[in-house]
Structures are given as structure tokens and as C-alpha cells.
Regions:
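AMP-binding/adenylate-forming catalytic domain of the ANL superfamily
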Residues: 582-604, 622-647
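AMP-binding/adenylate-forming catalytic core of the ANL superfamily
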Residues: 170, 177, 187-189, 340, ...
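Structural core segment of the AMP-binding/adenylate-forming
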Residues: 1-67, 130-131, 154, 158-231, ...
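Gly/Ser/Thr-rich phosphate-binding loop
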Residues: 312, 329, 333-343, 351-434, ...
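Conserved AMP-binding A3 loop
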Residues: 113-115, 250-274
Length: 652
């Protein structure tokens, strides 16, 4: 009897949700009919016998149903694509036939139609075959953002050649590593990156093709002019398109390198489709969107999630060579953008720009990406009149991806608390000393309760379009990301390396990277949370926080590095504000004032080098300060004071 009630209730609710849909403009959840909601709630109560579960159903079921419907759409789309052996080029060519003259890309005033992209990519594909590159060969693509960049990797994909999308900011050793780890057979570089390519020629002796020279000869000795060669190439579709499978490698995309050398993540055709489809359906995008995408196209956010809306879903994208905070809203208004992307610290950079009319004169109704700090969320939506921020959590290679479809401030997504195993991703407890999972007497992992911090992991299911982990080009790196015996003996999971917290309604909140949480005064300190506070108190300046070892003291003391090239920081007011919002153990013991800071290509601040340098004024030229607990203020960290701290005489 109760099973019948469940079926009737859920079916009724799904019918109501499907009928009423979702308001795309505001990303509001549908209002379920009272009867349908009552049936669902009663069904759950019968099966569980708890008032608490009824309350959870009341609070979360509308969200879960909308998310569930969309999730099913994503799954069906992916399974159908696998069944049809659909590849990214095939889906793109379908859009070409449908709308050949529709604008696909806008770049610095230029427009590229779908037909133009198709012809250029056909030339690339045929050229690669003519040059002897075979299915499965890798070619390093080292270029700045421009339409040709997308067309080149798309053309390679048409014939099964795998482009490795290299970060255009890399030089010397990291660049050499990125090219070699993917086993590249050749390099395609931009005209303006010839010097960087020339600097590594002794270590990387590969054929080089230069894009962007026009009719001029490349300045790089021995390199070939790709533009001229493509002009002579066949513009018709290469016959090898049909020999490429949905399970073949499409591209390599590299991790950001915030904690070491970039890792080359394997992206297969259906994996690319998963990323694009997930965002497309979860935030209810249409086919006539104009997407502002100022992100680097070598990264998953810009090159997969953003560009995939063009290649797979027939939308238009506005791209630019490099991100500009001052031009973000100006160009969004100019090109009539309806959707915009962000990543990392971009939203804070936008808040730091002077107010101007374009801040609210745009047509953008939803922004999606990851990296908005909870401390600036409401300020951002208010200033820029933004109906919804669709923050998502995930990584290029991750299988535990979630999304905030309601615009709930601070949240990076949700999982259902009523149907917990519908999406097999969990928070597991981690040993703070070793970083390894804590296990119960059965040898399986201990799951976190609401409010407890843990590492987010996703259960791996081989050959599943959404849950298979394809790993990296480096097999050792792949093995390090896999945990075993999570829920039961023999299962495996992808380790995100990120610490999240889930509230009782299933909303997830990013807390920290594993290893970024440090312990001081017997308390755990989240560097990410303190960074958000320090940055806001300092006037939204770039800031990183990390733990440093202090001789004679247990744990690590907090140290904040703040970018303040104009020497604008008022230490007195900064200290007072910091003490008002942070507990004493979380307040940084040391300050370092920087002229600038290294940033990854995806606008994440690097701090590993800063952490290694510590707080020795004899080794650091930047201004250093120490918080004097007796004076209750920051004082200049002199060599004499450093010696006292080093000898355990500073009263810590």
C-alpha cells in the first residue's frame, strides 16, 4: 500500500513540475500543487514515520524534483549519445546544417558563423591527415584566445587527433612538462608565443606550426606558417569523422597548477558532452543565448562548459583575448548577452571596479561558474542587478559535480537528503594529520553528518557516462586520486581533494582544499574562510592565507599575504575589523604586504611559494608584521623580533 502511495505522490509531483516548468528568467522553482505536495509528503511520512522527514520534504522536495527532472534529462541525453556513438564534431556539424549562417563566435568585433567555423576546422582536419598525424596522436595547442583556437582543436577532433590545450601563461619547465606529459607529436603555437616556444626548443624538439602570421614567415626558425598551409588544404569534411568514437579521447585539459605541476586530464567526447549538457539543462539554457565568455579557452570552464554551449547547443559566445574587469559589463551590454561566465576571483575583481551605468544596463539574467566567496555574494547580486548566480562545484576530471540551481547565497550546489543515493557523491571524514580517510571497524569510510566538514568523493562506475573517472596522462597521478572501500568493500571513488560542508537540507558549501586547513591554538582554521574575511576587511584586495610553522609552538600560525601596491591599507582599522569578525585563533599572526601576487590562468591565487618562504625578514623584501598580543596590534616584524620568535621568547 505504501509503495502505491509513493508512486502516486511522486508521479503527481513530477507531472506538476513538468507542467509548470521553471522560469528561465529568474531560475525560480515551480510551485507544486497542494495536492501533489501533500501526497508526496504523506508517502514519505508513511515510509519513514518521522515528522523531521516531513519537514525535510516540505523544505527540499520542490528543489529535488526540479533538479531530478533535469538530471534525468542529462542522463538520457548522454546515454542516447553513447548509443548513437555521437561525437562533438558530429553534433557541431548538425548545428551547421541547421543554422549555417548563425553567428557562433564574436571576437573583438569580428563574427564567425557556424559555416565559417566548420570550413576552417575541415581544413585543419584534412591538413593533419596530410601531415601524417594519426588517430590518437597528440598535438600541443599553445595559443591565446581567438576563434581559430577553437576551430583548430575542433578540426583535430574531426580526424581523431587529440589536442593538448596548453596554458598560454606557462614558460620554461612547466611548459616543457605540459607538452611532454601528453606525449605530444607537434606544437601549434600562436604568433605572439613564438619566443616562449623558442625558449624550450632544446628540451622539446618537435615540429612547430605557427598560427596568426598571415602571409608572413614565422620568426621561429624551422617553424611552418599554419595559415598558409591551411589555405591550401581541403575545406570539405574529412572522411575520418565517422571513424571517431564517443569513447575516444577528445582533448587534454590541464589542472590549474596551484599546488604543483599541471596534470593532463583526459577528456573523452562523451565527457565533454556531459559537462556541456549538465550546465545546459541544470540552469535551463535555451538555443538563442548569447554567452559572455572571457575565460581562457584552454581551461574546462571556458573551453568546455562555455564553448560547449556553442558547439553542442547552437548558442553564440562572446570571447576575448584576455579577461578585463572594466569591459565585462560594457561588452555584455554591447553584444546583448543573456548569460555570463565567471571563475575564481573574477566576481571580486568586478566589485572593485568603479560603478558605471553598464553595471545594471545589461540583459544578463544568470551567471554561472565557480569561485564566488560567500562574503561578497549578496553585495554582488545587488550591485549588478543579477537575478541568479548559478555557482557549481566540480573539476575538469571530477565525477562529483553539483550545482546551485536556486541562487542560494554561498552554496556551491546540493544533494538530496531524501533520496541520498540517487547521486552517489558523499562527504567522508578525513584524518587531519595524514589526509587519509577515517575508517570504521569494517574498514569502510565514515560519512559526515550535516555540519561536519569532509572530503567530497564520487563513487566510480566504469563505462558510465557521468561516473567514470578517466584519469590523467600520468598513471601515477591517476592512482593518487582514487580511494577504495568507501561504502562497501571493493568500491572505488574519485577524491576531489576539497573539503565541503553540507547543511541539514543538503546544500553544500566549499570550505577548503585538503592541506589548506591548519591547526592553531587547538583549533582548526580554514584558510579559504579566513581569506574571504581578510580580503573583504582589506577592501576586497587580493589576499591569501596559509599556515606557517613557528618554533616551539604546536601546529601552524596563520599568515596573510595582502596585495597593496599603493600602500593603502590602514592597519589600525584593519585590525579592529578583523577582531570583530574572526575568533582570536583564526586571526593571522603574521602579515605580508605584497606588490603583486602570482595568479593562475583561471584567476586563482597562488600561495605555495609564499608558504615556503615563511616570515623571515632577512629573506623577504616585502613588509612583514607580527600581531603583538600585549599591544593588541600589528607591529613591524624586525630581525630582532624574528629572533625572539625563533627562540621561543615571544610569548606564543
Amino acid at each position: 500500500m505504501w509503495r502505491t502511495a509513493v508512486i502516486i505522490g511522486v508521479t503527481s509531483a513530477l507531472w506538476a513540475a513538468g507542467k509548470q516548468g521553471l522560469s528561465i528568467g529568474s531560475i525560480m522553482l515551480p510551485r507544486l500543487g497542494c495536492l501533489q505536495l501533500a501526497l508526496v509528503a504523506a508517502s514519505i511520512y508513511i515510509t519513514t514515520g518521522g515528522y523531521y522527514t516531513l519537514w525535510l520534504a516540505y523544505k527540499t522536495l520542490p528543489r529535488d524534483l526540479v533538479g531530478g527532472i533535469r538530471f534525468v534529462k542529462v542522463q538520457l541525453t548522454l546515454k542516447w549519445a553513447l548509443y548513437r556513438n555521437t561525437t562533438v564534431p558530429k553534433l557541431f556539424m548538425k548545428n551547421v546544417r541547421k543554422n549555417p549562417n548563425k553567428v557562433a563566435l564574436i571576437f573583438e568585433g569580428q563574427t564567425w558563423t557556424f559555416a565559417q567555423m566548420d570550413e576552417y576546422s575541415n581544413r585543419v582536419g584534412n591538413f593533419m591527415v596530410e601531415q601524417g598525424y594519426k588517430h590518437g596522436d597528440t598535438v600541443a595547442l599553445f595559443m591565446h584566445n581567438r576563434p581559430e583556437y577553437v576551430c583548430i582543436w575542433l578540426g583535430c577532433a574531426k580526424v581523431g587527433v587529440v589536442p593538448a590545450l596548453i596554458n598560454f601563461n606557462l614558460r620554461q619547465l612547466p611548459l616543457i612538462h605540459s607538452i611532454k606529459v601528453a606525449d605530444s607529436k607537434a606544437i601549434i603555437c600562436g604568433e605572439d608565443l613564438q619566443d616562449a616556444t623558442d625558449a624550450i626548443r632544446e628540451e622539446v624538439n618537435l615540429p612547430v606550426y605557427v598560427s596568426g602570421c598571415g602571409t608572413a614567415a614565422p620568426s621561429l626558425e624551422g617553424a611552418k606558417n599554419l595559415d598558409s598551409l591551411l589555405c591550401a588544404s581541403n575545406p570539405t569534411p574529412p572522411p575520418q569523422i565517422d571513424s571517431v568514437s564517443a569513447k575516444d579521447k577528445l582533448i587534454y585539459i590541464y589542472t590549474s597548477g596551484t599546488t604543483g605541476m599541471p596534470k593532463a586530464a583526459i577528456i573523452k567526447h562523451y565527457r565533454y558532452l556531459f559537462f556541456c549538457t549538465g550546465v545546459h539543462y541544470m540552469i535551463a539554457l535555451g538555443e538563442d543565448e548569447v554567452i559572455y565568455n572571457p575565460l581562457p579557452l584552454y581551461h574546462s570552464a571556458g573551453g568546455m562548459v562555455g564553448m560547449g554551449q556553442v558547439l553542442i547547443y547552437n548558442n553564440t559566445a562572446v570571447i576575448r583575448r584576455k579577461f578585463s574587469a572594466s569591459q565585462y559589463w560594457v561588452e555584455s551590454k554591447k553584444y546583448g548577452c543573456t548569460v555570463a561566465q565567471y571563475v575564481g576571483e573574477i566576481c571580486r575583481y568586478l566589485l572593485n571596479t568603479p560603478e558605471k551605468p553598464e553595471d545594471t544596463q545589461h540583459k544578463v539574467r544568470v551567471m554561472f561558474g565557480n569561485g564566488v566567496r560567500a562574503q561578497i555574494w549578496n553585495q554582488f547580486t545587488s550591485r549588478f542587478n543579477m537575478p541568479c548566480i548559478a555557482e557549481f562545484y566540480g573539476a575538469t576530471e571530477s565525477i562529483s559535480n553539483i550545482m546551485n540551481i536556486e541562487g542560494k547565497p554561498g552554496s556551491c550546489g546540493f544533494v538530496s537528503v531524501l533520496f541520498r543515493h540517487a547521486f552517489p557523491a558523499y562527504l567522508i571524514k578525513i584524518d587531519e594529520e595524514t589526509g587519509e580517510p577515517i575508517r570504521n571497524k569494517n574498514g569502510t569510510c565514515v560519512l559526515c553528518k550535516p555540519g561536519e566538514a569532509g572530503e567530497f568523493v564520487g563513487i566510480i562506475k566504469r563505462n558510465h557516462p557521468m561516473r567514470d573517472f578517466h584519469g590523467y596522462a600520468d598513471r601515477n597521478a591517476t592512482e593518487k586520486k582514487i580511494a577504495r572501500d568507501i561504502l562497501k568493500k571493493g568500491d572505488t571513488a574519485f577524491r576531489s581533494g576539497d573539503i565541503l560542508i553540507m547543511d541539514e537540507l543538503g546544500y553544500m558549501y566549499f570550505k577548503d582544499r585538503t592541506g589548506d586547513t591548519f591547526r592553531w591554538r587547538g583549533e582548526n582554521v580554514s584558510s579559504t574562510e579566513v581569506e574571504g574575511v581578510v580580503s573583504k576587511v582589506a577592501g576586497n584586495k587580493d589576499a591569501v592565507v596559509y599556515g606557517v610553522e613557528v618554533p616551539g609552538a604546536e601546529g601552524r600560525a596563520g599568515m596573510a599575504a595582502i596585495v597593496d601596491p599603493e600602500d593603502e591599507l590602514d592597519l589600525h582599522s584593519f585590525t579592529l575589523s578583523l577582531k570583530d569578525v574572526l575568533p582570536s585563533y583564526a586571526c593571522p599572526l603574521f602579515l605580508r604586504i605584497l606588490k603583486d601576487i602570482d595568479v593562475t590562468g583561471t584567476f586563482k591565487l597562488k600561495k605555495l611559494t609564499l608558504q615556503k618562504e615563511g616570515f623571515n625578514p632577512s629573506l623577504i623584501e616585502d613588509k612583514l608584521y607580527f600581531f603583538d598580543s600585549k599591544l593588541q596590534r600589528y607591529v613591524v616584524l624586525t630581525a630582532e623580533l624574528f629572533n625572539k620568535i625563533d627562540q621561543g621568547q615571544a610569548g606564543l
